[in-house]
Curated annotation (Swiss-Prot):
Keyword Oxidoreductase part of the UniProt annotation: yes
GO cellular component: endoplasmic reticulum membrane
The protein, known as: Acyl-CoA 6-desaturase
A Pfam family recorded for this sequence: Cyt-b5
Organism from which the protein derives: Papio anubis (Olive baboon)
Homology family: Belongs to the fatty acid desaturase type 1 family.
Name of the coding gene: FADS2
Amino acid sequence: MGKGGNQGEGAAEREVPMPTFSWEEIQKHNLRTDRWLVIDRKVYNITKWSTQHPGGQRVIGHYAGEDATDAFRAFHPDLKFVGKFLKPLLIGELAPEEPSQDHGKNSKIIEDFRALKKTAEDMNLFKTNHVFFLLLLAHIIALESIAWFTVFYFGNGWIPTLITAFVLATSQAQAGWLQHDYGHLSVYRKPKWNHLVHKFVIGHLKGASANWWNHRHFQHHAKPNIFHKDPDVNMLHVFVLGEWQPIEYGKKKLKYLPYNHQHEYFFLIGPPLLIPMYFQYQIIMTMIVHKNWVDLAWAISYYIRFFVTYIPFYGILGALLFLNFIRFLESHWFVWVTQMNHIVMEIDQEAYRDWFSSQLTATCNVEQSFFNDWFSGHLNFQIEHHLFPTMPRHNLHKIAPLVKSLCAKHGIEYQEKPLLRALLDIIRSLRKSGKLWLDAYLHK
C-alpha cells in the first residue's frame, strides 16, 4: 500500500490504497447480474465482461462469489497472456485478515495440490510429444481410408457395409478423443493453434461445433457432477442421478418416467440415441441460433465430404441412413466411456470444495492397459485429466502415482477399477438411484 499525494517536483506518484473486501461481501455478488470472483486474493468484477469470456459466460459465472484461483490456472496454460484481460476488471483485494479460500476450504490440501502441479511442471509433464498426436491423426485418416476401400472394392452388400460402418464408427470415436485434446489446449503451446486444429478435427472430421463443445465441456470440468452447473448431469427428466436428485423427485411426486426402471430403459434411449438424435440436433441448432458461421462451415465440409464419398454407393437416402447408423454405433462407445468415470460418483448440489477434492469426489479411473488407453482416449485417467486438463494425455500416467500419494496423505479416496466393472457400475448406479426415487415417491 502506498500513500496519496506528491512530495514536490519530480517525486513519484504514490499508489492509491486498493479497496479491501471480506468474503461475506464477495459472496453476495454471485448473481447473473452481479458477479465478483477472486484470483490470487485479487477481487474482480466480471459482471459485464463475462459475456465476452472466450470459454463462455456460464463457466466463469459458476465461480461468482468464490475463489477461482485453481480453476483459472487449470484452464489457462498461458497465465501471462490471459492476465492482461483481468487488469481492467480489478476492483480490490481480500482484506488482510481474510483467508485465501472461501467456505472454509482446506488450505493444506490446496497448498499441497499447487506444489504437486509445480512438480508436474518441473517434470515437463505439460510438454507435448507431437509425434504421438500426429500418429493419432494418421490412424484416424487410415481408418477412414480403409472404410472407403472396403465398400469400393467389395461393393455395397450387407457385410461390406457393416464392416465399413464399424470402421467409420471407430474413426469417429477416436476423432472424438482427439478433438478433446485440442479443445483442452493440451497439444500446442499457442492456444490459437489448438483452436484452429480443434475446429478442423471436430468440424471437418466429425461434423460438430468447437464452440458448442467448449461452452458445454468446460462447465463440466469447472463444476463436475454439480446440479445446475455441470450440463453433463442435466438429464432432462429422463434419468435421476446420485442420491439427492431421486429423493427430491420422489418427495415432489415427479414421475416423468418410471425411474425405478431407468437401469433397463437406459439401454434403449441412452447409448443408442444421445449422438444421432440429441447431440446432432443440439449442435446444429446451437450453431444457427448463436450464428457460429465458422463452425457451421467446418461442419458442412464434413457432410459434403461424407455424402460425396458414399452417395455413389448408397444413393442419397441410403447414405443418410448409413450416416445415422454410424452415429448410432459411435454413440454407444461414447456414452459408456464418458459415463463410467462420472455417473457412478457423487452427484449433488454445490458443496464449495477445493479444486483437488471436487475433482476426486466426481471422478474415478479405469485401470491402465494399451487397449484401455486407446479405447477411452486415455480418459481412463479421468482423475488426472480433471486435475490437469491441459496436460497432454500421454503424460497422465506419469503423474498418477503422485496424485495417489496426495490422496492417501489427506484421506481422500482414489478410485480405480477394471474396465468391465466400471461399465457395470453405470447400471448399478442407475438402479440404486431408481430405488431411492421409488422409496421417496411411495413413502415420503
